[in-house]
Amino acid sequence: MCNSKPSSASSSLLSCKDKTHISKLETCDTDNPHYSEFRDTDSLDLKRWPSFLEGLEEVKAIGKISGPTAMTGLLMYSRAMISMLFLGYLGELELAGGSLSIGFANITGYSVISGLSMGMEPICGQAYGAKQMKLLGLTLQRTVLLLLSCSVPISFSWLNMRRILLWCGQDEEISSVAQQFLLFAIPDLFLLSLLHPLRIYLRTQNITLPVTYSTAVSVLLHVPLNYLLVVKLEMGVAGVAIAMVLTNLNLVVLLSSFVYFTSVHSDTWVPITIDSLKGWSALLSLAIPTCVSVCLEWWWYEFMIILCGLLANPRATVASMGILIQTTALVYVFPSSLSLGVSTRISNELGAKRPAKARVSMIISLFCAIALGLMAMVFAVLVRHHWGRLFTTDAEILQLTSIALPIVGLCELGNCPQTTGCGVLRGCARPTLGANINLGSFYFVGMPVAILFGFVFKQGFPGLWFGLLAAQATCASLMLCALLRTDWKVQAERAEELTSQTPGKSPPLLPIASSKSRSTSGTEDMMRTMLV
């Protein structure tokens, strides 16, 4: 086995046989009869199960991307916890105001920026597989411009947050603290508009370790920054917000320096011209549904907190919900990293015209996701009587947490495969299908079940989690149905059409399916009929 380096122009972990396979594809002529014979042979691979060695090789390939990505996720999670600790150090009012502002920022800003940035993932991943390197640079420029333009109206909403919160009936003191926090956090929006595309740009080229190292350095500096601004300079809530901004600034500087000084950009760099403002149809057709999908899932948890406030003893239920959401956020790091890894693998393979390899990646990743779900479920059941003690000593909150944790574990059993499935759909450039599945599962199934069990059947706090369980089970089932019916040859053809763009030409609107495949791509139509 001869593996390429992560930063090389070829996909990682390709065997010598695979490289020969690539060279055949590069030199073949589609009008040559041998090309059809090659495609017919490839069709046989699209119907068989991968061998043990193929599966092991794919696990290694996904692990090289997902492993460092998981470490990066854990580091970012620890950064959020450090910020919460310093807010708690300032007092109960500051903790409440900071928590409220972060929730508002998640709904109105961070979810939007994160979701829109992921629209570039299939384009860059497939372009890297197809060796259309200039398309990576052009897509990076377009995505940064898109995110920066979206950050401006979001900033204005943050400037008026106090008025919005008071209109919603929030406490005046807490609203004032939240307004102060967000006022100093506005630069974070513009930094994330650079940071998210940079990370995706590197990951789609199988470059992940430098991102992890840069994140580790930034998080290590996050503690002294908070100490200096909050404790020494006594800047209060503003100090916590400024520390968050400076940490992201450090990360942007470190990643930009890596890209520049290692010449990672040399093959992908496109001069900034008027072309950056043209041909946005393909990017927007992916970014908008991806953003909708991300926002639908993020917003669900905020709605759950609102519903908790309507239950008996809202103080205990809201506190317990906060603990459990922090727990699911920690667990989510692992399926999310697997999702990002498989998205990169599938987009690379489809771009390189290897649909059989993309199918293998899907199969292996789903088995890995099921294993992760089982581990998460066992973990939740085993720690149900002890986990809450890490956050509080209140007996009622501890009781609610211990009752709900096994249900949370069952939710993760569905969440891990469905999150991985979303990664597969992103790699195939099919985010609209993922958005429709999320909409139907969380809001047409999960929300009614949560209200029914929580309030009508008087199950209270656990009833709300039954709603999430119903949503995750539905989402995983629909996602599995869509993936099993995927025509991988069609997806390779779509990838070829997407990556045939060249700088200077406006790309066509990305099709849902090519004209050849309308009879074989009924999954999308079926899902739209069911869920919209």
Curated annotation (Swiss-Prot):
GO molecular function, one term: iron ion transmembrane transporter activity
Induction: Induced by excessive iron, but repressed by iron deficiency. Induced by heat, darkness, osmotic stresses and acid abscisic (ABA).
Family matches, as InterPro entries: MATE_euk, MATE_fam
Top-level taxon: Eukaryota
Tissue occurrence: Highly expressed in shoot apices relative to leaves. At vegetative stages, highly expressed at the stipules. At reproductive stages, most highly expressed in the mature pollen. Also expressed in the tips of sepals.
Region of interest called Disordered, as start-end residue ranges on this chain: 496-532
Pfam families membership: MatE
Gene Ontology annotations for the cellular component aspect, listed alphabetically: Golgi apparatus; Golgi membrane; Golgi transport complex; intracellular organelle; late endosome; late endosome membrane
Transmembrane annotation, as ranges: 65-85, 95-115, 136-156, 174-194, 211-231, 235-255, 279-301, 322-342, 363-383, 397-417, 437-457, 464-484
Localization per Swiss-Prot or TrEMBL: Golgi apparatus membrane; Late endosome membrane
Disruption phenotype: No visible phenotype.
GO biological process: iron ion transport; regulation of plant organ formation; response to abscisic acid; response to absence of light; response to heat; response to nematode; response to osmotic stress; root morphogenesis
Composition bias, Polar residues: 514-523
Keywords, in A-Z order: Endosome, Golgi apparatus, Membrane, Transmembrane, Transmembrane helix, Transport
Coiled-coil ranges (or none): none
Principal subcellular localization: Golgi
Record's bilayer topology term: Multi-pass membrane protein
Family classification: Belongs to the multi antimicrobial extrusion (MATE) (TC 2.A.66.1) family.
Role, per record: Functions as a multidrug and toxin extrusion transporter. Contributes to iron homeostasis during stress responses and senescence. Could be involved in specifying the lateral organ initiation rate. May act as a negative regulator of hypocotyl cell elongation in the light.
Note: Plants overexpressing DTX48 in initiating leaves are short, produce leaves much faster than wild-type plants and show enhanced growth of axillary buds. Overexpression of DTX48 alters shoot developmental programs leading to a loss of apical dominance phenotype.
Protein name (Swiss-Prot/TrEMBL): Protein DETOXIFICATION 48
Taxonomic placement: Eukaryota, Viridiplantae, Streptophyta, Embryophyta, Tracheophyta
